[in-house]
C-alpha cells in the first residue's frame, strides 16, 4: 500500500518516512510512503525530494491538493528526472471548482447546487502533459473523473509519454444522477 501524504503531520522528512514505513510485526501489508512534493503540501516550496527518495519514498504528491502553479510543476518534473522519481498530481483547477459540490450538469441545476465543470480537470491534465512533453519524466494523475481526461492520457501514452492514472472507486459506481434521490449516504 502506498500512503499519500494526507496526514498530520505531512510526510515530508526522512523521519516521517521511517515512521510510516516501519515494519509492523504480524501484519501482512507493507506500507510505502508517498512524500509531499511541497512543504506542508501547500504548493509553495519544494521538499527535499532527493533526500526523501533516498529514505525510501516511492513517489511525490501533495495528496488531495492539486499543484496549481505551472512553474512549480515544471520544476518538480525536472527535479525528479535524475533519480526517476514519480510525480502524482490530482488535476483540478481549484478556481474553476471553487464552491462546487458536484459535477456540473442537469442534476446540479435541478438540485440548485453549484457544479464543477469537467474542463477544470481536463485543462490541468493538458497542462501537465505539455509540461511532461517538455521535461520528460513520469507523472500519475490521481482520481480522474472525466472521459475527456482519460482520453488525454490515452493519447499521451500513444505518443510515448510516461503517464498513468487512476479513478476513485466511487466515481466508477455512482454518477450525479444518483444524487437526485437526496440519499445522505452519498454525501
Segments from the language model and where they lie:
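Active-site beta->alpha loop and helix N-cap motifs at the rims of alpha/beta catalytic domains
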Residues: 36-42
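A glycine-rich helix N-cap at a beta->alpha junction
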Residues: 22-36
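Metal-associated gating/positioning segment near the N- to mid-region
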Residues: 1-25
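Histidine/acidic residue-rich metal-binding segments in metalloenzymes
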Residues: 44-187
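Short acidic, glycine/proline-enriched helix-loop-strand junctions
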Residues: 12-16, 29-30, 80-85
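Active-site neighborhood of phospho(di)ester-bond hydrolases with catalytic His/Asp-centered motifs
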Residues: 1-9, 32-35, 61, 90, ...
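Surface-exposed, flexible loop/turn segments at secondary-structure boundaries
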Residues: 8-9, 39, 95, 147
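Short amphipathic alpha-helical surface micro-motifs
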Residues: 13-19, 41, 124, 147
Amino acid at each position: 500500500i502506498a500512503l499519500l501524504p494526507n496526514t498530520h503531520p505531512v510526510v515530508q522528512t526522512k523521519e516521517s518516512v521511517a515512521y510510516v514505513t516501519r515494519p509492523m510485526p504480524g501484519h501482512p501489508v507493507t506500507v510505502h510512503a508517498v512524500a509531499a512534493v511541497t512543504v506542508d503540501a501547500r504548493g509553495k516550496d519544494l521538499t527535499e525530494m532527493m533526500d526523501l527518495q533516498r529514505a525510501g519514498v516511492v513517489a511525490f504528491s501533495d495528496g488531495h491538493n492539486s499543484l496549481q502553479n505551472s512553474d512549480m510543476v515544471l520544476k518538480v518534473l525536472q527535479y525528479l528526472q535524475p533519480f526517476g522519481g514519480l510525480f502524482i498530481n490530482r488535476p483540478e483547477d481549484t478556481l474553476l471548482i471553487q464552491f462546487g459540490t458536484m459535477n456540473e450538469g442537469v442534476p446540479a441545476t435541478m438540485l440548485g447546487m453549484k457544479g464543477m465543470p469537467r474542463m477544470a480537470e481536463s485543462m490541468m491534465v493538458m497542462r501537465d502533459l505539455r509540461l511532461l512533453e517538455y521535461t520528460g519524466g513520469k507523472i500519475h494523475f490521481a482520481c480522474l473523473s472525466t472521459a475527456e481526461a482519460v482520453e488525454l492520457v490515452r493519447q499521451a501514452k500513444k505518443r510515448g509519454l510516461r503517464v498513468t492514472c487512476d479513478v476513485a472507486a466511487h466515481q466508477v459506481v455512482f454518477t450525479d444522477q444518483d444524487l437526485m434521490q437526496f440519499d445522505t449516504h452519498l454525501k
